[in-house]
Amino acid sequence: MANRSYIYLKNGDEARILTEGIYTIPYFWQLFWDEEDLKAPIALWETAEELEEDEEQAERFYQEQNVDILLPIEKFRQSALQNRSFLEENVPQALKLYDAFVRYILANVKDGDVLGFDLLDVVFMDQVSVVADKLLKNIRAIRENQPKDLDFSLTDENLIGLAMGFPDYYASELLLEDNILDSDAYQDELKKMNPQEDKKVLDMTESDSKGNKPRVLLVFWILLALGMMWVLYIIFS
């Protein structure tokens, strides 16, 4: 199973996934943060890293602590607008998708929502200290408009996978307003994707999101057949 990161709208115990990164932390997300937003999560990631060899302690830790980055919606709105100029100057071809993505998030906000980022699986692909340094370096590079200092490339054409993240398979059911799947920006970028390599990634997101649906259908048909056999047995016995 792939290491994934998620951006989602959180309201109490409810989480509505917007998009997911596969083996990466999409760079649009990083335009929404500042150093203060990462301070507490990084400390928790470091603690989690120390507990990884003790499954019992690690499980208890995850039950007691939320290790995700959580942003108030208004702060997200301000950061998204403020850092848009970074894209406008350095990667203008990404603006159409970025604007559609921000609009998609804001259109689906409910009262009491916060914007969450679950990065732990991707963070743990390396040492926490290494990943934390890269994220903080990226935040500074964006703030100071120094694209050469970024830890990711702005020239890669796969904006869906590397910049926005892949939309959740069930997004159309959970997040109905300004659905990113229906936007011209998303459809335009989808056409640019490598039809072979990127289809594999899309298939991974779809199959994981579908979960055990084929298995459930198989059980349903087996039970239906057994039920019909039982009815026939009663009728003809």
Name the predicted role of every residue range.
Residues 106-107:
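Leucine-rich repeat
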Residues 1-39:
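Short, extreme N-terminal segment that most often corresponds to the first beta-strand
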Residues 230-237:
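Juxtamembrane boundary at the C-terminal end of a transmembrane helix
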Residues 1-5, 10-11, 110-230:
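Acidic, proline/glycine-rich low-complexity IDRs
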Residues 39-90:
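Low-complexity, serine/threonine/proline-enriched polar segments
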